[in-house]
């Protein structure tokens, strides 16, 4: 049932994007749905579009961190969280994620 709802949500956000392709939040919402569906590359493509429209979009930057973590691109994920922290320095989640990812990078280098 959840898959059907995600498919429907993706379709609706696609319709919204077709109506207004310059609305960053529509791209960001579809990126979120695609991430939840496990379609990480497609999610990243939508995030790229969001960041072309609004380079300081906090949600897209943190979402990119999640996508890159899922793809095991830990350094790219860290870079995304660094940018998110610059945009929203009082939000703690990017710092927490950066610390966790630094540990993953250290494990990889052993």
Q: Can you say where each PLM-predicted feature lies in the sequence?
A:
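Alpha-helical tetratricopeptide repeat
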Residues: 1-110
């Amino acid at each position: 049932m959840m898959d059907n709802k995600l498919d429907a949500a993706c379709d609706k956000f696609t319709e919204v994007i077709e109506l207004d392709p310059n609305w960053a939040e529509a791209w960001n919402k579809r990126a979120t749905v695609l991430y939840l569906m496990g379609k990480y590359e497609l999610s990243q493509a939508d995030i790229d579009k969001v960041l072309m429209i609004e380079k300081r979009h906090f949600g897209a930057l943190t979402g990119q961190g999640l996508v890159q973590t899922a793809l095991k691109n830990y350094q790219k994920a860290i870079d995304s969280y660094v940018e998110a922290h610059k945009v929203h320095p009082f939000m703690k989640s990017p710092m927490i994620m950066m610390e966790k990812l630094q540990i993953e990078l250290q494990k990889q280098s052993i």
